[in-house]
Amino acid sequence: MAKPTKKTGSKKTKRNVPNGVAHIQSTFNNTIVSITDTAGEVIAWSSAGASGFKGARKGTPFAAQTAAEAAARRALEQGMRQIEVLVRGPGSGRETAIRALQVAGLEITLIRDVTPLPHNGCRRPKRRRV
């Protein structure tokens, strides 16, 4: 007969991280918010899809706001107070995600746009004709 296995608790440890970096990746289809410490270790993350939105609604500013609020709530539980914000991508949820982080109680010290721009690299996809 098999031995009963021991139940172990959650492997997540509560860390006290006073300041970190919020990475907001905003595409036309989704918005992903990752909050890391200064070394780059992810402390909290959320996305529009993880917040319960499906399909075309994931790309809306309200979905980005909801995702940012959820990530900020988890970061505040870890003791985070100040963040720098790095925004990447052309999506519609950029400004609302930043505003949601601020309203949630995180002090924003820096906002930087780190959208990658090609120096004429790969060929663009052909234009849509609708």
From Swiss-Prot:
UniProt-listed Pfam families: Ribosomal_S11
Keywords: Ribonucleoprotein, Ribosomal protein, RNA-binding, rRNA-binding
Organism annotation: Prochlorococcus marinus (strain MIT 9303)
Gene Ontology process terms (BP): translation
A GO cellular component annotation in the UniProt record: ribosome
Name this protein carries in UniProt: Small ribosomal subunit protein uS11
Bilayer-spanning residue ranges: none
Role, per record: Located on the platform of the 30S subunit, it bridges several disparate RNA helices of the 16S rRNA. Forms part of the Shine-Dalgarno cleft in the 70S ribosome.
Taxonomic lineage of the native organism: Bacteria, Bacillati, Cyanobacteriota, Cyanophyceae, Synechococcales
Gene3D superfamilies: Ribosomal protein S11
Subunit-structure text: Part of the 30S ribosomal subunit. Interacts with proteins S7 and S18. Binds to IF-3.
Domain of life: Bacteria
Homology family: Belongs to the universal ribosomal protein uS11 family.
Molecular function GO labels: rRNA binding; structural constituent of ribosome
